[in-house]
Amino acid sequence: MDHYTELGEANTKDMFRKAYEEGYAVPALNFISIEQFNAIIDAVIEKRSPVILLASPNLHRQLGCEILARIVQSGIDRIHGCGLDIPVSLHLDHGMTFQHCVDAVEFGFSSVMIDGSALPFEENVALTKQTVEYAHRHQVTVEAELGVLSGAEESGDGEGNGESLYTDPQQVEEFVKR
């Protein structure tokens, strides 16, 4: 198991805390190719900006967590090679199962998103709680999804299906408490 700090990554929650205190935003950017990854690292170096690198489900399936973590480590090495110490984190975006999140934590991701939004409320709560308990033992930040946004997430084509499944605001407080 590689802890994200061994790969040179920053804790996502710490990045958010500092950004909030100092009044700036941290970009969270998906990359789907090495060219995009290198362009992001070039921009991080040029702008001296922290970044959260998002590993999409497709990229995760294609490369796996270990290779993704090593790619990000190479970018962090490039940043350090320029004499810079800029926070970078690797985030599993839309992890659909507990095992996806475990794999990400085991191979050095500093944050994960567990997406149980397609599950009934109680199952989503249970899945999220299981993921949070595991990830927090490794100082890994967790994002969870409750409900879906109208549009692209519903149908995959950006058109929506006419039957929106917005997040129920009354469920949010209960979801967070549990």
Q: For each predicted feature, which ranges?
A:
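Terminal accessory/targeting
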Residues: 2, 6-7, 16, 20-28
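Short catalytic-loop micro-motif centered on adjacent basic/acidic residues
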Residues: 26-30, 90-91, 113
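Alpha/beta enzyme core
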Residues: 10-21, 34-59, 66-84, 94-178
